[in-house]
Amino acid sequence: MQQDVIALKIDDKIIDLQTAEAQGIEGGEPVYFDNSPEALEVIRHSAAHLMAQAIKELYPEAKFYVGPTIENGFYYDLKTETPITDKDLKNIEKKMKALAKKKFDITRYEISMEEAREKFKNDELKQAVLDMIPGDTVSIYKQGDFEDLCRGPHVPNTKYLHNVKLQKVAGAYLGGDSKNEMLTRVYGTAFATKEALQEYLKMLEEAAKRDHRKLGTELELWMFDEEVGAGMPIWLPNGALLRGNLEKLLYSAHIRREYLPVRGPELLRSHMWKISGHYYNYKENMYFTEIENDDPEKPADEYGIKPMNCLAHVKIFGHKVRSYKELPLRLFEFGTVHRHEKSGVLHGLLRVREFTQDDAHIFCRPDQIEEEVIKVLEFVDSIMERFGFNYEMEISTRPEKSIGSDEIWEKATESLKKALNSLNREYGIDEGGGAFYGPKIDIKITDAIGRKWQCGTIQVDFNLPERFDITYVDENNERVRPVMIHRAIIGSFERFIAILTEHYAGEFPTFIAPIKAIFVPIAESHVEYAKKLQKELLEADINTEIFASNDSLNKRIRNAEKRRVGYVVIIGDEEVETGTVAIRDRKKREQYKMTKGEFVEMIKNLSEVKL
C-alpha cells in the first residue's frame, strides 16, 4: 500500500509540503507517514498545534508561548484563567481526536513583522515570541479557526493526528527564566500508528515500575534530604556496597589496561579556571568560595570547586619534563565533581549536583590518537557487554568557532573514524557538533526496555595542552605539544547506577549486587549455621544478610524476596544435619539444594568478575 508523503528532507533539513509549494522547492527525499524519526518530528510538531487548538476551544482565553518537539514527544507552554491540571488532560485529548476527525487542512502563510505585531497586539506571549524571531517576515500555520506563529514543519492535514496521548502538566517559567512569570506546560506524544503508541505507553508503564527513585527507596540504596541540599545524594549501606563493587571492578580494569591512578583536589584557585577558560565560559555552572590569604594585607583568594577533573591531570603531566618514550600516558581518577543544575532539572541520580566520574586523560602524540581510541573503544565493549547493554556512537566534528589548525582537526577526526572503522563499528556524524577544542565520540546505551541513555564520551582536546603550555621532548630533542584525550566510559557512577537499577529492575547481577544472598533460618536453632556461612563468605568480601526476626517464616521469605537478591537461602534441620542449603534462585525462578561448599564456591565464582 502506498504511504502518504508528509514532508521532504533536503540537505538534512525537514521541509513540509506547504513550505515546499510556497517556495517552489522541488526534489528532496520524501518523508513518509510512518514512525521514522523524521516523520515523528513532523507529526509531533503538528500534534502540539492540535493540542493548542483543542485547548483554545475549551479555554477561549488561553494564550500560547512555544510548542516544540522534544525527545519522544512535545509540549506547549501556555496560560489560562482556569488552571489546567492532569485531571483535564482526558477531556483535552478527547477534543483533539474530535478535531483530527474533521480533517482540517493545515495551511501556511507569511506576514510582515509589523503586521504580526499588530495582529497579536493583545497577546503578550506572542509578543515575546516575536521578540525572538529575526528578520522582517514571520510564518503562521492555520488549521480550522486556530492559527499560530511557527516555522514548521507540519503535516498537511489533521487526519494524520489520531494517535496522540497527553501525559502530564507541569510549570515552566517564561523563556526558562525564573525571574519571569510561571506558565503551564502540557506534555504529550504522538505516533503514526496506534500500535506504536500502545507499545510506547506500555514501555512507560514498565519504566514506572523500574524507576530508580522508587527502587532506590524500596531497596534502601540511597536517599535525598532537603536539609542536606537538593541534588546531593546520600548513599545508604546497600547503595554504598553496590557502588563500591562497581568502583572495585572498574578500578582493577583500569590498572590492567596500564592506566595510572591519580587524585586531584576538590578546590582549585580561580586562576586555574581562568587559564582553562572555564571561568569565562562555564562559571554559571560552578560553585566558588574564598579562602583568606596568609598575608592579612592581601585580599582572600577565590577558589572554584571543580566541575571536572582535567586540570589537575594537566598539572600532573606538566610537573616534570616528559619524554616521547613515556607516551601515551594514561591517568585516571574516580573524581567527585560539583556542577550547579537548576532545581527543575534535578532527577534522582540521573541529574544531580554532586557526582563522581570515571575520568581518564590520555596524553599522546597525534599519530597515537587512533590506536588509543581503539583501546578505549575495546574497553567500552568489555564494560557494555558485561552489563548487557547495546550501544551506539556518534562523531561530532569541528564547529564554526574552534581552535587548532585545519590539518590537526582533520587528522584527529579521521583518527576517530579510522578507530571506529577498524572495529567495524557503525556510527553517526554530528556535523559541527564538536567542542571548540576538538572532535569527540558520544556513547549512547540502550537499556532492557529500549530507552537510550547518553553515558560515555571520548573527546580529543588541543586546547588545554596549549593553555597550560605542556610539552614533551620528542626524538629530535625538541619540545612538542601533546594531544589530550578526555575519556569517561560510564559517565558518572551516580547516573550509571541509576541506569543499572532501571535496566535490571533492581535485580542486580551477583558480581555487583550489594547483598549476594539472604539466609532465612527456620528456627533459632538454625541461626548459628547461617552465621558460619555468612562469616565464610564475608572473608571473601561477599556480603550477605540473615533474616532471623520473630516474624513468621513465610513473612521473612517474602521480605527477603522483596529485596530482589539473587538467592534466598532457607536453612532448617535437614540442611544443618546434611551440610546443605535450600536455595530459591530469583533469576532461574527455581528452587534447589546444594551442599554448603558448592553454594559458597558458586557465590565466589559469580562475584569474581573481570572486565
Swiss-Prot record:
It comes from the Bacteria. Its cofactor is Zn(2+). One of its GO terms (molecular function) is threonine-tRNA ligase activity. CDD domains: ThrRS_anticodon, ThrRS_core. Zn(2+) binds at residues 310, 361, 486. Its EC number is 6.1.1.3. Residues 211-509 are annotated as: Catalytic. GO terms for cellular component: cytosol. Binds 1 zinc ion per subunit. One of its GO terms (biological process) is threonyl-tRNA aminoacylation. Keywords: Aminoacyl-tRNA synthetase, ATP-binding, Cytoplasm, Ligase, Metal-binding, Nucleotide-binding, Protein biosynthesis, RNA-binding, tRNA-binding, Zinc. It catalyses: tRNA(Thr) + L-threonine + ATP = L-threonyl-tRNA(Thr) + AMP + diphosphate + H(+). Pfam families: HGTP_anticodon (PF03129), tRNA-synt_2b (PF00587), tRNA_SAD (PF07973). InterPro entries: aa-tRNA-synt_IIb (IPR002314), aa-tRNA-synth_II (IPR006195), aa-tRNA-synth_II/BPL/LPL (IPR045864), Anticodon-bd (IPR004154), Anticodon-bd_dom_sf (IPR036621), Thr-tRNA-ligase_IIa (IPR002320), Thr/Ala-tRNA-synth_IIc_edit (IPR018163), ThrRS_anticodon (IPR047246). It is found in: Cytoplasm. Homodimer. HAMAP family: Thr_tRNA_synth (MF_00184). Belongs to the class-II aminoacyl-tRNA synthetase family. Catalyzes the attachment of threonine to tRNA(Thr) in a two-step reaction: L-threonine is first activated by ATP to form Thr-AMP and then transferred to the acceptor end of tRNA(Thr). Also edits incorrectly charged L-seryl-tRNA(Thr). This is Threonine--tRNA ligase. It comes from Nautilia profundicola (strain ATCC BAA-1463 / DSM 18972 / AmH). The lineage of its organism: Bacteria, Pseudomonadati, Campylobacterota, Epsilonproteobacteria, Nautiliales. The gene is thrS.
